[in-house]
Regions:
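Phosphate-binding site recognition
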Residues: 1-223
């Protein structure tokens, strides 16, 4: 959280990229750092124009009547935000790869805006598809390569921290970590059950378990 806060508090506006596999707490971390004057938008897989309508509605909470206009493309909505900005704030686009899937031109649009160095607000671009986020920002042929001021990759929590936080003996920590790894959301589900065996059955092995289809979803993220 401290690194993200520092990046957003710099003298000039920043482009911050955050990525990592699902359920690591990226969205929670970002929301914890953002203030009431910042804007958080969670994208979905609907087409680009619909996404802009949804984003405009969220932005209208900060900029009154922002959603009264129609924005025909991504450049127009980003420039409209810039025009309305009189005090720096942060705009977070979560699940950014979903936007790019529907609007392949979006990285080039952002490249243009960033290169102009006229943006008056911070941009945080977050995503769970590690392959896609890597390709968008760390591939030397990508439009946004070298444009990010900070690139943060969230990794699973390491075993020693889990053991200490939950006050587990060494053997129990290894057994539990072998199942749940260092993923905070998995540990939340584990805490709802009295024993490891019960949690394993209820959450993973049962066809009705919350995590029963989790492996498939994780592979789909990296297609």
């Amino acid at each position: 959280a401290a690194r993200l806060k520092d990046a957003l508090a710099r003298e000039k506006s920043s482009l911050v990229v955050m990525y990592g596999r699902r359920r690591l707490g990226k969205s929670t971390l970002i929301k914890r750092v953002l203030s009431d004057t910042d804007v958080y938008f969670l994208a979905d897989r609907s087409e680009g124009q619909h996404q802009r309508i949804l984003l405009a509605k969220v932005l209208a909470q900060v900029f009154p009547d922002f959603d009264k206009l129609t924005y025909p493309d991504w450049e127009s909505i980003f420039r409209a935000v810039n025009y309305r900005t009189d005090k720096r704030f942060t705009l977070c686009l979560d699940e950014f790869p979903y936007l790019v899937e529907q609007s392949p031109e979006l990285p080039s649009v952002l490249q243009k805006l960033v290169d102009e160095k006229q943006l008056k607000y911070n941009l945080v671009l977050c995503g769970s598809s590690q392959n896609m986020m890597y390709g968008l920002f760390l591939d030397s042929t990508a439009p946004l390569y070298g444009r990010a001021d900070e690139i943060m990759r969230l990794a699973p929590i390491r075993l020693p921290y889990i053991q200490e936080a939950l006050n587990l003996d060494a053997m129990s920590a290894i057994e539990e970590y072998a199942v749940w790894g260092g993923v905070p959301r998995y540990w939340e589900l584990r805490e709802n059950r009295s024993s490891l065996d019960d949690a394993l059955w209820r959450n993973i092995l049962s066809v009705n378990g919350t995590l029963y289809e989790e492996p498939i979803k994780l592979f789909q993220d990296e297609d």
